[in-house]
């Protein structure tokens, strides 16, 4: 389903008060990851903005404007602008600040296994990554982060948001294709896979953000 249509339908549920807290948080984080840079640009270059409506309507797409207005109204236009103009704008922290996501400063989790296949491969191969982790105290809103460091020290990776992960064993899978590009040449040598589980955003300086567990694994591209 088109992401904009999905946001519209979810927003209707939110307004009608039938959305769970986890669904509300996902709505906010999806919106912030997609629209944060545009909102920052509007906040910096949009002139005098005196209301949440004036800010959010500049997004130009009704579902995005609706989610923006819900978040902005929770803290007021001045509070929302402060969040957008922070030195380290953080989608999860913003969603927590506008009360659309929860946090748990006692969250606890341990990575139990990280695998990559193949352990030694060629340029052009697809590398599959797997991670298992044990949550022993609920992760309210956090991330799985994987990062690959090449032999020259350049990095690439992705994150996946975790919402309301109650104590249990969890797993996730990722992949990347080692196809050279302007961003990553994939030189031959030893690479390091870095895996982190976090409450909040991994590496964020904001409150309620910290690394719960990390693990490293080396692999080779020939």
Swiss-Prot record:
Record's keyword annotation contains Signal: yes
Annotated ranges, domain Saposin B-type: 21-105
Glycan-linked positions: 108, 134, 218
Secretion signal span: 1-20
A Gene Ontology molecular function term of the record: sterol binding
Main location: secreted
Disulphide bridges, residue numbers: 25-101, 28-95, 56-68
Gene Ontology CC terms: extracellular region
Domain of life: Eukaryota
A Gene Ontology biological process term: sterol transport
InterPro entries reported for this sequence: SaposinB_dom (IPR008139)
Record's subcellular location: Secreted
Keywords tagged on the record: Disulfide bond, Glycoprotein, Secreted, Signal
Keyword Secreted: yes
Function: May control the size of the multicellular structure.
Family label: Belongs to the countin family.
Protein name: Countin-3
Underlying gene: ctnC
């Amino acid at each position: 389903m088109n992401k904009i249509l999905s946001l519209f339908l979810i927003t209707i549920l939110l307004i009608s008060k039938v959305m769970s807290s986890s669904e509300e948080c996902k709505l906010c984080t999806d919106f912030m990851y997609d629209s944060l840079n545009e909102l920052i640009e509007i906040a910096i270059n949009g002139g005098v903005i005196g209301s949440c409506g004036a800010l959010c309507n500049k997004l130009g797409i009704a579902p995005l404007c609706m989610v923006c207005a819900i978040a902005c109204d929770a803290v007021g236009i001045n509070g929302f602008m402060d969040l957008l103009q922070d030195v380290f704008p953080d989608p999860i922290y913003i969603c927590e600040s506008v009360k659309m996501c929860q946090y748990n400063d006692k969250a606890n989790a341990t990575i139990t296994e990280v695998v990559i296949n193949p352990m030694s491969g060629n340029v052009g191969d697809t590398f599959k990554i797997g991670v298992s982790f044990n949550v022993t105290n609920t992760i309210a809103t956090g991330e799985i982060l994987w990062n690959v460091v090449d032999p020259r020290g350049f990095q690439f990776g992705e994150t996946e948001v975790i919402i309301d992960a109650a104590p249990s064993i969890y797993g996730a899978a990722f992949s990347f294709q080692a196809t050279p590009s302007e961003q990553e040449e994939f030189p031959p040598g030893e690479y390091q896979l870095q895996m982190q589980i976090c409450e909040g955003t991994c590496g964020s300086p904001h409150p309620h953000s910290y690394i719960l567990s990390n693990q490293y694994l080396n692999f080779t591209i020939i």
